[in-house]
């Protein structure tokens, strides 16, 4: 497969979060939108073709995940991390933001403390604050070698916190915390 990574696609006026919300988020449009993880490359042919084939059914009803979907995750986790997981431990969510909001709502109660590690993906803040949990900040430490965790502070905070929302690889630091 050969892909053209030099092709520029104008995504303005396509309801693109990355491009069409610059003015409302930043107050101006003449910025490079590096604030959201969104691709600017054409979708791979085999993905586009699969979507087109599915769209040709002319019915867009409710769908479910085949067992093969979850089995591929179980197999990948075992192959790459030697983790023994089970399909019944998994649930599908339509995105990572939905997933960690559901985790906050399902695994903690109002006024529980939740630790996040800024600088961090801004929806982490919303997931804590919007569900009436107490935000506990464990800022990463910027060193000459890169960002590191403040484990001493984390150990103290973990005594009373009910959850740590961890971003790894870290967004926006763009580094894997555990090498």
Question: Where are each of the predicted segments found?
Answer:
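Short, solvent-exposed loop/turn segments at secondary-structure junctions
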Residues: 37-41, 121, 170-172
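Active-site phosphate-binding strand-loop segment of PLP-dependent enzymes
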Residues: 141-179
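N-terminal small-domain helix-loop-helix segment of the aminotransferase-like
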Residues: 2-95
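Glycine/Thr-rich phosphate-binding loops of Rossmann-like dinucleotide-binding domains
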Residues: 100, 124-125, 173-174
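Conserved PLP-anchoring active-site segment centered on the Schiff-base-forming lysine
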Residues: 104-128
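A short helix-loop-beta submotif of the ANL/AMP-binding
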Residues: 130-136
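Short beta->alpha connector loops at strand-helix junctions that form conserved
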Residues: 118, 137-142
């Amino acid at each position: 497969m050969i892909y053209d990574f030099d092709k520029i696609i104008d995504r303005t006026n396509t309801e693109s979060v990355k491009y069409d919300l610059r003015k409302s988020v930043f107050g101006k449009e003449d910025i490079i939108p590096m604030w959201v993880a969104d691709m600017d490359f054409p979708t791979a042919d085999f993905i586009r073709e699969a979507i087109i084939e599915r769209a040709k059914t002319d019915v867009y009803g409710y769908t479910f995940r085949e067992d093969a979907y979850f089995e591929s995750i179980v197999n990948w986790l075992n192959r790459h991390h030697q983790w023994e997981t089970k399909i019944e431990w998994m649930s599908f969510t339509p995105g990572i933001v939905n997933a960690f909001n559901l985790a906050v709502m399902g695994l903690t109660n109002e006024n529980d403390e939740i630790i996040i590690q800024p600088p961090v993906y801004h929806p982490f803040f919303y997931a804590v604050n919007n569900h009436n949990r107490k935000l506990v900040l464990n800022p990463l430490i910027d060193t000459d070698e890169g960002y590191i965790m403040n484990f001493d502070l984390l150990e103290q905070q973990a005594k009373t916190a009910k959850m740590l929302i961890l971003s790894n690889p870290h967004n926006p630091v763009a580094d894997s915390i555990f090498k």
